[in-house]
Regions:
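Conserved catalytic core of the tyrosine transesterase superfamily
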Residues: 2-330
Length: 330
C-alpha cells in the first residue's frame, strides 16, 4: 500500500476514492499539473513547483503528471497535509501545500472537479511555526576577510570575485539573480542594477555603492563593457570567457573557495542576503524599503530577518543579576 494509502487507512474510516483510482490517463493538454506549471511565468518557479508536485505525488507512488489530481478529496488533502507537516519544515511544507492548491484550482478550471469538491479539498490551514530564518549573519570582519583575499589575488578572478561578493553583500541579490545579471542591467554612473525576472518573475532595482561599485567598475575594465553576462567564467590561464555567463553553481563554488582562503566558517550566498536585510533594519531603514530592495512581496518575510527584537530581549535579560563572580583561582 502507498504511503498516502496508509495515511488514509489510519486517518479516515470511509475514503470516498481509493488510492488505486489516483492514477490518471488524462491527456497532457488536460492534465491540471501541466496546465498549472504552464501558467507560472519564470523557469525557476516552474522547476520549484514541479519538484513540489512530484514530492506530493510520490506519497502515492506517482509523479506530478501521473497522479489523478482531480480525484483528490478533502480526506486525501488532509492526509497529505499531515504527512507534509511530519516530514518537512513549515516553510517547505507550506510551499508544497501552495502547489497542491494551485493544481487543484486548475483541475476545477478544467471542469474536472466540482466547485464544492474543490473548495473542500483546498480548505487546509497553513502549517504554523515560529522559526528563525535559515543560515547565519556574516560579520563585517568576515566580509572584509573575503574582500581582502580577493584584493590580494592579482589574477582576473580576484577582481571578478571581489565584485561578486560586493554585489551579494550590499545589494542582497539571490545567487540565481546574480548569475543572470547582464552588463546592460548595470548603470556605471549611478551603480543602479536592474534585477530582471527575480523570484515570482518580479523586476526590481538595487544599487551598488562605495566599494561594491568600485569593484564592479574594476571588473568591467577587465571584462569589457560589451553586452552579455555581467559575470563570466575565467579559465585556468586567466583568460576571461565571454561565451557564457557563470552559473549559480559556479558562484557557489567560488564562495566556498574564497571562504576557505579567508578562514571564514561555512556560509552560503543567502547568508549575504540575510545579513543585508538585517543590517539595513539595524540602521533604521524602514521595513517597506528593505522589502523592496530584497524583492520580498510581503514585509512579514522581511520582518523575520529583523535582529532588533533579539537585541531588545538581550538588553532586558541584562537587567537581571545573579550574585556570582568568577573565581580567581582553582
Amino acid at each position: 500500500m502507498s504511503i498516502l494509502g496508509t495515511y488514509l487507512e489510519t486517518a479516515m474510516t470511509d475514503p470516498i476514492i481509493p488510492t488505486s483510482q489516483l492514477v490518471t490517463t488524462t491527456p497532457l493538454s488536460q492534465n491540471p499539473a501541466v496546465v498549472y506549471l504552464a501558467r507560472l511565468t519564470s523557469a525557476l518557479s516552474k522547476r520549484t513547483m514541479r519538484a513540489a508536485l512530484d514530492k506530493i505525488a510520490a506519497l502515492d507512488g506517482q509523479d506530478a503528471f501521473t497522479l489523478h489530481w482531480a480525484a483528490l478529496r478533502y480526506q486525501h488533502t488532509l492526509a497529505i497535509r499531515a504527512r507534509l507537516a511530519a516530514d518537512y519544515a513549515p516553510a517547505t511544507a507550506n510551499k508544497l501545500l501552495s502547489a497542491l492548491r494551485g493544481v487543484l484550482k486548475e483541475a476545477w478550471r478544467l471542469g474536472q472537479m466540482s466547485a464544492e469538491d474543490y473548495q473542500r479539498a483546498v480548505d487546509l490551514e497553513n502549517i504554523k511555526a515560529e522559526t528563525l530564518p535559515a543560515g547565519r549573519d556574516l560579520s563585517f570582519g568576515e566580509i572584509k576577510a573575503l574582500a581582502d583575499v580577493c584584493m590580494n589575488d592579482p589574477s582576473p578572478a580576484g577582481v571578478r570575485d571581489a565584485a561578486i561578493i560586493g554585489v551579494l553583500a550590499t545589494c542582497g541579490v539571490r545567487r540565481a539573480e546574480l548569475a543572470s545579471l547582464r552588463v546592460e542591467h548595470f548603470e556605471t554612473d549611478s551603480g543602479k542594477i536592474v534585477i530582471r525576472g527575480g523570484k515570482g518573475n518580479k523586476d526590481r532595482t538595487v544599487y551598488a555603492t562605495h566599494g561594491a561599485l568600485d569593484a564592479l567598475l574594476d571588473w568591467l575594465v577587465l571584462r569589457g563593457t560589451h553586452l552579455g553576462a555581467l559575470f563570466v567564467p575565467i579559465n585556468k590561464g586567466g583568460s576571461v570567457q565571454h561565451e557564457r555567463g557563470m552559473s549559480a553553481q559556479a558562484v557557489y563554488k567560488m564562495l566556498v573557495k574564497r571562504g576557505l582562503e579567508a578562514g571564514v566558517k561555512e556560509f552560503s550566498a543567502h547568508d549575504f542576503r540575510r545579513t543585508f536585510v538585517g543590517d539595513l533594519l539595524d540602521r533604521g531603514v524602514d521595513i517597506a524599503t528593505v522589502a523592496k530592495l530584497a524583492g520580498h512581496s510581503d514585509v512579514k518575510t522581511t520582518a523575520r530577518y529583523d535582529r532588533r527584537p533579539e537585541t531588545t530581549k538581550c538588553d532586558a535579560a541584562g537587567k537581571l543579576h545573579f550574585p556570582y563572580h568568577r573565581r580567581s583561582s582553582w
